Amino acid sequence: LPLDRLSDVDRYALARYGEVASRVLRAYDRYEFQTVVHTLNNYLTVDLSAFYVDISKDRLYTFGPGSDARRSAQTVIHTIADGLTRLVAPILPFTADEPWRNLPSADADSVHLADFPTGVDTLVDPELIDRWTRVLSLPGAVNGEMHKLSTEQVTGSAPAAAVPLPPHP
């Protein structure tokens, strides 16, 4: 699907990928391999595994093959899988070859003959990233307040609590 037909959360996932890929490419240019590894590891565990893949599963498993919601997630997952495979190839050469052989978009016989992703800076959308960062911070803030209220015995249980949300800017 084209970018303008992707869901908001899918555009956020793509924007975060663009941000991470840009940082990784700069680190490679500077031979800062520790930054490459740290950035990719954090992105894979926090952004992808703990968030995006988790919330995309329902759309991928239950929506019809032609639905925009499913195709939106598939488009983003494919773009990220292609780009990440290229980005990890220098540090995980054998590991990167396996997904590369299974990507329908693989444009070379080996990931090691393929170019790094280009144009990733254009995927970055600071306003979208900022908005989703605020949204994703809410559960932690709410849980922190709930814990504080329960230890102060202001409320006995979560259903009895009310948490005021900050106004939308």
Question: What kind of feature is each model-predicted range?
Answer:
Residues 1-25, 53-145, 149-152, 158-167:
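Acidic, turn-prone loop/beta-hairpin segments
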Residues 28-35:
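Short helix-adjacent coil turns
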